[in-house]
Amino acid sequence: MNDLRLTENQQALVDAEESMFAAACPGAGKTRAMVARFLKRTAEEERRGVALLSFTNAAVDEVRRRCGEHTRVLEVPHFVGTFDTFIHRFIVTPMYTTAYRKKPNYVQRWRDVPSANFRLSRMGQAKDLQLDWFDFAPDGRARLIESRIPRDFGNDAVRADLLERKRAAEEYASHIFGRLIDAGTISCVAARCLAEYWLQDAQGEQILAPLLRSRFAEVIVDEAQDCGREELRILQFLKQQGTRIIMVGDTDQSIYEFRSATPDRVRMFADNLPGRPIELKDNWRSTPAICAFNRSLRCGQLPETARGDNSLNLTPVHLIEYRSPDQIVPAALDIAEHNKLTADDLILLSHAEKHGMKAAGVHGVDSGKQNRIARIASAGHVLRSRTTDPRARRKAVDHVQHSVLAALTIDEKPGMEHLGFDALCERVGVDPRWLETFAVRMAISLDTHGKTRDVFAAEVRAFLRTAEWGNAKAPSSGSLGRLFRAPNESVWDGVVSTSTGPAIAFSTVHGVKGKEYPGVVLVLPERLRVDDVTTRTVVDDWEGGHHTEARRVLYVAASRAQQLLICAIHKKYISRIEAVLDNTGVPYTRV
């Protein structure tokens, strides 16, 4: 794509004078156009600010990078950050501080808080219930979402028992939710609930309206299709205060239904914006075959045309038929080599992490089952590997940090179960940033190569015992012995077998949203998820033209590819996928 000149429709987005929605296909240069608009609008506003919001830190970092030397646009009164950070800083913090006379402590997820898990009486061998399985109304009432209950929660009888006791579970979840709010521990979910509550409360509206009206002249929303009920309520409130709303997105890339993001709500909101809608329909990323594959998955009517250098690449989509997951990587590498790509150019994508890991030959470490020694060993492998993505590295560091923090808090007095990670660090006297550095250093320093599980466990305990803890109280040898025991042989064998790392990088589809790669290997596993309501799989949805999130996930995955798209399809589904591609005119070859 030309690095200097915007297309006509991109320029229209930059120059729009009313609140509006711009629909952008994959690779349409939306970030480039949004940053151009952001720079233009910040230069025009003398007193009020312009906010540019997205939904991931990676997307925000990319916006900041593209602002280049224009660093003043990243300073007050302007704002570039995630929508969650916007909610925290400009809505929840001022309101919570006023109501509770203390500052809130934000945590990313409920599972970062020990007391966010709970049990009902007579649950037997079932796992703990988690607040993440519930939706919360603005008044704090919980609603159990059956589809969020993991399959390994318990057998059919256990699941049936939970559903029979649904009201009791919801009441308990509401109680814990309220206790956490009172304690000042606010997850992203809780912050969105509180924001919605205060925006519909007369007193809250009276406080927030002048604050937001005087601060922001315009809010630009990237990946607008990911807006849920709460985000749309906030945008409506801002619009009512006279703030201009610019939304850019692709409703076919809406894959966050677990946080109440639904394309229909976004379309309805966008349809009521006064400005003329704009379509960015030129794909500057992918080949014609990949664009055709994308169109076969798209539910909306936005056209998509290959442009730029890759528009001249006539490589077809490649289908791999496999019976066993270990057949995928060798076949993909052969195809890549034939197309002048290397393993470093590829990424293996799957909807569920376990399917991608299995195809890549990686044994997962389940944070709910594995002991701390296994987590630390596995984290070291992840951090030393050249093929792990940032999300996997972040997850690995989190596992180690929480393991270390457990050692520092085990001897503390009761009453810490409602505290989040940062609050726990403050209680025991360690800086969270120091703890992160310590966790990385420990995981990388301790190598499993040639060591038994007992030897490695002893090295972990020694590392912690001899560490310099500064103002924090060092953990006792007894505590270290109880917390850091060697895993059993089968777990250790699984950890050690992954020490060399996978041949191809892998990730979930959600982990690469907004990114692009020369080659993508998309895995359709043998056991496809069956929707609890429709009883259909993603292949059923694709064949039948049903508009579902599972289908949109495949669309997001395929549209990351620039030059080569490989679909690894289990033998059970290969003929059905071929029929779909034939019917939709997708150029492909089967190997």
Predicted regions and their residues:
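The feature marks helicase ATPase cores and/or their adjacent C-terminal helical subdomains
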Residues: 1-591
